[in-house]
Every structure is written in structure tokens, then in C-alpha cells.
């Protein structure tokens, strides 16, 4: 998925992402990526924190008090989890940002994406 679009959705600057939600780096094989993520010394300030054995923490997003932003963020993370569980490693690697968004059906998330010009598809929701 396009890093620029994920950065815009996260409401963080590149510097904030590097400090609070760093990436583990890219490995060629998803199994190597998971092993590296679980066994690295990166600490908890990574985009997906796997430090605790029974917890997965998504740290990409800035905090918010706005209900529509919170709702859209939770819906995006839910969709991300659904996609990750239902697709093969190769399908995930081949997926674009727009392929990912095409499967979204939650009207609040669609509206949020449209308002921020992250996705435009007028057939999905009628304003």
C-alpha cells in the first residue's frame, strides 16, 4: 500500500512516525518479516508493536478526540485485520491502496476518506 496515503490517514508527520511508530524494515519473505518483528530490539515504538506476547498494538495513528476520526480509524484497523487474515502473503504484497479501499463498506470510513481526499468513489456512498 502507498506509504504517502497511509501517512496522510495516520495524521502524523514522517518524523512522528519515525519516533512513535517506526517500521521494522522490509524483508523479502513475510515469514522473515514476522520473525524479525517479533525478535528485534526495536522496542514498543513501532508501527505494529508485538512486544507483549498476547497483544498486537497498532501505533500508526495520532490520538484524537474527534468521534468521526476515531470511528474511521477503528474501522480501518478492523478492515486491515480482516484482509490480513483472509488473504495469502502474495495477495497482500500485490495489493494496492486502492485495492484495499475497494473492499471497504463502512459509510463512516468512506466519508472520512473522501473528506481527506484519500479515496474518491462516488458509487460507494451517496452524499
What are these regions (language model features)?
Residues 1-5, 125-127:
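Conserved small/polar residues in nucleotide/adenosyl-binding loops
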Residues 4-62:
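Aromatic/basic-lined ligand-recognition segments
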Residues 5, 19, 72-75, 79, ...:
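Charged/polar, solvent-exposed surface patches and flexible loops
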Residues 8-13, 82-118:
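Flexible helix-coil linker/hinge segments at domain or subdomain boundaries
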Residues 60-65, 94:
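Short, exposed beta-strand "edge-strand" segments with a Pro/Gly-rich flavor and a Y/T-containing core
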Residues 66-89:
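An acidic, glycine-/histidine-flanked metal-binding catalytic module
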Residues 119-124:
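C-terminal helix/juxtamembrane-tail motif
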Amino acid at each position: 500500500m502507498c506509504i504517502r496515503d497511509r501517512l496522510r490517514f495516520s495524521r502524523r508527520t514522517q518524523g512522528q512516525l519515525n519516533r512513535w511508530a517506526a517500521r521494522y524494515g522490509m524483508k523479502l519473505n513475510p515469514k522473515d518479516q514476522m520473525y524479525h518483528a517479533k525478535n528485534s530490539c526495536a522496542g514498543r515504538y513501532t508501527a505494529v508493536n508485538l512486544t507483549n506476547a498476547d497483544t498486537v498494538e497498532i501505533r500508526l495513528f495520532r490520538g484524537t478526540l474527534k468521534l468521526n476520526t476515531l470511528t474511521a480509524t477503528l474501522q480501518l484497523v478492523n478492515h486491515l485485520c480482516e484482509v490480513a487474515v483472509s488473504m495469502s502473503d502474495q495477495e497482500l504484497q500485490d495489493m494496492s491502496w486502492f485495492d484495499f479501499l475497494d473492499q471497504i463498506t463502512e459509510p463512516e470510513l468512506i466519508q472520512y476518506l473522501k473528506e481527506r481526499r484519500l479515496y474518491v468513489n462516488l458509487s460507494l456512498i451517496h452524499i
